[in-house]
Amino acid sequence: VNQFKDEVLAQHDTDKINLLFNNAGIGGGGSFVEGSREEWEKCFAVCWYGVYYCTRAFIDHIVSSEEGHIINTSSINGFWASLGGTPHTSYSAAKFAVKGFSEALIDDLRVNAPHVNVSVVMPGHIGTSIAENTGKILGGKRTEEDLEKIKENMIKMGLPVHNFSPEQIEQQIKENAEAFKNNAPTTSAQAAEIILSAVKRKEWRILVGDDAKAIDEWVRGAPEDAYNISFNGERREDI
């Protein structure tokens, strides 16, 4: 990260940074109880430490600028740790950390660097390659046991894969990743426009997508119901 910082400063011939976008993220590490510790910690490291280390590396250069803004990407899973009733622990824990860190910086910057703003971005379903890239980053060939667990999760999410072979599950994973990107209600270009417009207005809390706004409203309106199995199904039908 420090090498990246040095290269950015050198390429732009400056020691000051005005905008820092922390946007790295992968999935994986679904179950804390039964999942791989290595996969869990890799997902958490990318999603949380990617934000922390980059902010730590660039903070002095942001503070030394006349005006600065830190933009951290959390998720709807940073305030609602659910994914269709299936385990989603590492990603959600990391995105909660990003949201908490960003909110804590508001007072810190107001006191110690009032010319620097911070925003936390909470996207809903955006058409990106995160599902596909997660597999590339986590690496390794899936075992039949891995595929069986994935199959069980797909069934819980309502996918008709009961009679699928391991090879068919692999193909379904690929198709799901493509569908996640191509069938999203909000494209990455639309998300970028929403985020940049909100940053210009110096909003600290940026919800991206109608689904994100709806889920935020539902969770705030009925927090005790947010993790009931029926909550997820009812809300999906309403979006």
Region locations from a protein language model:
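Conserved amphipathic alpha-helix within the SDR
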Residues: 1-15
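Conserved NAD(P)H cofactor-binding loop of Rossmann-fold oxidoreductase domains
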Residues: 23-28
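Substrate-binding pocket helix/loop in short-chain dehydrogenase/reductase
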Residues: 31-32, 39-41
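A short, exposed helix-loop element centered on a Lys and neighboring polar residues
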Residues: 55-56
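Residue(s) in the substrate-gating loop at a strand-loop-helix junction
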Residues: 75
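The catalytic Tyr-X3-Lys active-site helix of short-chain dehydrogenase/reductase
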Residues: 81, 88-97, 101
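SDR active-site lid
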Residues: 111-206
